[in-house]
């Protein structure tokens, strides 16, 4: 196997050694964990709540279906899945601070019995093959170092007939709105982050990471190469975000 330790990868618009990205991403989310939900409201003007509602509905929650929620963060997807009638959830995140927030929310909503929590790297899941019905990742894939590996791991742990879902910021498809979107992302958002969270740099990184993430067709191709079948995607809000899905058949 080739030594990739000296390779560089993107971290926003910067490049860093491959081995450093995980640490730097962890620092970002340590910083924003307590205000993560506010951050999502700022980045999407609150529309992320509608996107997540559609995302979970597409997963078709059923009591007999199990969910692995990758980069589960503050628990939004896991809790929505349970509220919609889904079965047991394992919520994972590489960042322990984020999981603590998610656990607290689950306790507040009296749904702690339905969720397991694990600090785990989506690139090397500590799970056996073919063990879950659904795998989800929402606003997390762009922060992973090796996205191809995450997709391969998601497929590995899915049962035959299982389905993978990804909700992520993507490429705006409305050209006339692009100048305003750029100004919002790179001028307004970091300024708001500095004022609300006293953390301009983290919000700057998050805006940059969106632009560096593969576009809709590129991500669909990556999923097919990982072995997913019947891959499709749905644009949300003109392509500001997109839901991708693929089956393990």
UniProtKB/Swiss-Prot annotation:
Keyword field: Menaquinone biosynthesis, Methyltransferase, S-adenosyl-L-methionine, Transferase, Ubiquinone biosynthesis
For the ligand (S-adenosyl-L-methionine), the binding residues are 74, 93, 121-122
The highest taxon in the source lineage is Bacteria
| GO biological process: one example | menaquinone biosynthetic process
**What Gene3D superfamilies does the entry give?**
Vaccinia Virus protein VP39
What Gene Ontology terms describe what this protein does at the molecular function level?
2-methoxy-6-polyprenyl-1,4-benzoquinol methyltransferase activity; demethylmenaquinone methyltransferase activity
Q: Which CDD domains match?
A: AdoMet_MTases (cd02440)
Pathway as given in its UniProt record: Quinol/quinone metabolism; menaquinone biosynthesis; menaquinol from 1,4-dihydroxy-2-naphthoate: step 2/2; Cofactor biosynthesis; ubiquinone biosynthesis
What are its E.C. numbers? 2.1.1.163, 2.1.1.201
Catalytic activity field: a 2-demethylmenaquinol + S-adenosyl-L-methionine = a menaquinol + S-adenosyl-L-homocysteine + H(+); a 2-methoxy-6-(all-trans-polyprenyl)benzene-1,4-diol + S-adenosyl-L-methionine = a 5-methoxy-2-methyl-3-(all-trans-polyprenyl)benzene-1,4-diol + S-adenosyl-L-homocysteine + H(+)
| InterPro entries on file | SAM-dependent_MTases_sf, UbiE/COQ5_MeTrFase, UbiE/COQ5_MeTrFase_CS
Which Pfam families does the protein's record reference? Ubie_methyltran
Role noted for this protein: Methyltransferase required for the conversion of demethylmenaquinol (DMKH2) to menaquinol (MKH2) and the conversion of 2-polyprenyl-6-methoxy-1,4-benzoquinol (DDMQH2) to 2-polyprenyl-3-methyl-6-methoxy-1,4-benzoquinol (DMQH2).
The protein, known as: Ubiquinone/menaquinone biosynthesis C-methyltransferase UbiE
